[in-house]
């Protein structure tokens, strides 16, 4: 009887599966350094689901300034004495990490951001789109550097017809009484610019033609070939756009002989060139 009592029951070795129990998580290390994690869970329908995940561990090395690393290892003092290293959330608020990316065209980006923000830009930014325009030939250069400043008057400016009368009136208005003293700078002829050395007599034989309605595809060499049939051409100026480098629609042709210029003006006025009709006339002379 004692032998039967000490004998183990066969029912104790029987294992009963618990339907609510899940198998343990299995972690397997692969040869390529990754890990495969197998776990089980119940879905919304109460069914057992097997989940397999493959995890790859990446080590990121950060190079820190040695002085910065040394300061981080300092022991805290004062009210923070004895606390763990690093910022404490009850005394330190960590702001957003702003990534600084240097850019080559940072000036253009800053100007665009300023423009979008509605702020008034600098005077340089306001004038950067302005173009220089000559008052004589309407070209994109300063009037003082115009090659025709000595041979023609500004565009759309009337010639000096009553200039002498205006000078006489201005001079007479100062000293109306007989014998009254008139300062040198207010005397007749002093208000206008002085005569250039040999200016009027030197430029008498120079003839310049103004050619308008010129095609955008015109070239200075082509214009020179067209007008050199009537005489020697000393200078050809074709106004071009600074950005597109195309002709702006007008040009100036200077001849050595005025008779050749007159013949060219008569023959070339109304001449068809690149599907356009040229308008040729004598350029206005400066006074």
UniProtKB/Swiss-Prot annotation:
* Segments of this protein annotated with the region Disordered: 1-34, 159-184
Which Gene3D superfamilies does the UniProt record give? 3.30.70.330
Report the GO molecular function annotations.
Answer: RNA binding; translation initiation factor activity
Query: Which is one Gene Ontology cellular component term of this protein?
Result: eukaryotic 48S preinitiation complex
Q: Its GO biological process terms?
A: formation of cytoplasmic translation initiation complex; translation reinitiation; translational termination
Per UniProt, the keywords (alphabetical) are: Cytoplasm, Initiation factor, Protein biosynthesis, RNA-binding
Give a single Pfam family match. RRM_1
Residue span(s) of domain RRM: 207-285
Which PROSITE patterns does the record match to this protein?
RRM (PS50102)
Q: Where in the cell is it found?
A: Cytoplasm
UniProt subunit comment:
Component of the eukaryotic translation initiation factor 3 (eIF-3) complex.
Q: Which PANTHER family match?
A: EUKARYOTIC TRANSLATION INITIATION FACTOR 3 SUBUNIT G
Q: What does this protein do?
A: RNA-binding component of the eukaryotic translation initiation factor 3 (eIF-3) complex, which is involved in protein synthesis of a specialized repertoire of mRNAs and, together with other initiation factors, stimulates binding of mRNA and methionyl-tRNAi to the 40S ribosome. The eIF-3 complex specifically targets and initiates translation of a subset of mRNAs involved in cell proliferation. This subunit can bind 18S rRNA.
By sequence similarity, the record places it as follows:
Belongs to the eIF-3 subunit G family.
Q: What is the protein's name according to its record?
A: Eukaryotic translation initiation factor 3 subunit G
Please name the source species: Aspergillus oryzae (strain ATCC 42149 / RIB 40) (Yellow koji mold)
Q: What is the lineage of its organism?
A: Eukaryota, Fungi, Dikarya, Ascomycota, Pezizomycotina
